[in-house]
Amino acid sequence: MKKQNNLRSLAAQAVEQVVEQGQSLSNVLPPLQQKVADKDKALLQELCFGVLRTLSQLEWLINKLMSRPMTGKQRTVHYLIMVGFYQLLYTRVPPHAALAETVEGAVSIKRPQLKGLINGVLRQFQRQQETLLNEFATSDARFLHPGWLVKRLQNAYPTQWQHIIEANNQRPPMWLRVNRTHHTRDGWLGLLEDAGMKGYPHPDYPDAVRLETPAPVHALPGFAEGWVTVQDASAQGCAVFLAPQNGEHILDLCAAPGGKTTHILEVAPEADVLAVDIDEQRLSRVYDNLKRLGMKATVKQGDGRYPAQWCGEQQFDRILLDAPCSATGVIRRHPDIKWLRRDRDIAELAQLQAEILDAVWPRLKPGGTLVYATCSVLPEENRDQIKTFLQRTPDAALSETGTPDQPGQQNLPGGEEGDGFFYAKLIKK
């Protein structure tokens, strides 16, 4: 491989773009993966995800082992050293190879004069590893979460916050959704077993299967033919609560990338579905998902606060609002969220959610169902949001999910091994 495509330096650049520039890893990583051989793509992903998962520990180690931080044009070296620490702590890469490749990464980022520094810091860590890790185990950084988020979780879940943090710091399981228009879940599990893999059904969500060991999608029976889709179990709860019926007019708002749109159509193939999202780029993935599954829906770009712009005066039998949120329930799947979110974002998101709810409620027919969902675990976006909505909306009633005092159903990450998710099912009187 060409030296400029040193795997460790690419990982360092990816993490730097997330932490310093506020970019999403899902946007940063794919173009970098194009620069490496197929056999190295998984390791590059592991290094990026792993460093972001354990960032506060790696930052703590750098502060212990270096007298001053790397700044300016040398900042990438700061993250390159983190990549070195991560390999030594969490991967099966032999230590000598981890050191050699990480040090060589300095050449790829045009900082060859810092090879000695990188080597020295990593070797110092190896010598002091046990002492450093014992000290780290009593530090505030041990939770691997920003302090503001730890405080919010402690306040919201006095007895469960550590469980949530531990779940967030795990690698996520791989969940699939069996397309019931092609196979029963048990039937597809048989095909999976024939292919030499094992899966387990979810007790509550009828299409959900957890793979014993994550696998590339091309290895899954019938993936290209639309027999199965990658989707977390908790996300599948949206269509379960929505309970779409054939012939109904259904709005899927904030629909990209289309996993819930296609699930609605698997449950009710004759439903008339409008999928709307504000992000035109992400809508391309809705089209891709519909095409792979051989389904049809109307897809439009639009802002949920202004429905007149994308549906005129149309009303719907059912509305799924998968609201923009902090995504604090899916941190194990997207560890960059911990470092992209800020404490002040929560109030802004709650305000946006309230505006969308108020704007779209008049578009629900009397007797119709609206499912409000987020992949957050924070009450400001979930129970508190629905509680205040019910107080100001006299023709809205809660159904199936919770009580007026504690509205909605909150799934915590790791519960039945799904992501953190919230649902509130509302009926228009």
Curated annotation (Swiss-Prot):
It is found in: Cytoplasm. GO terms for biological process: regulation of DNA-templated transcription; rRNA base methylation. S-adenosyl-L-methionine binds at residues 254-260, 277, 303, 322. Residues 400-412 have a biased composition (Polar residues). Residues 397-419 are annotated as: Disordered. Disulfide bonds: none annotated. PANTHER family: NOL1_NOP2_SUN FAMILY PROTEIN _ ANTITERMINATION NUSB DOMAIN-CONTAINING PROTEIN, NOP2 YEAST -RELATED NOL1/NOP2/FMU SUN DOMAIN-CONTAINING. Specifically methylates the cytosine at position 967 (m5C967) of 16S rRNA. Belongs to the class I-like SAM-binding methyltransferase superfamily. RsmB/NOP family. This is Ribosomal RNA small subunit methyltransferase B. It comes from Salmonella heidelberg (strain SL476). The gene is rsmB.
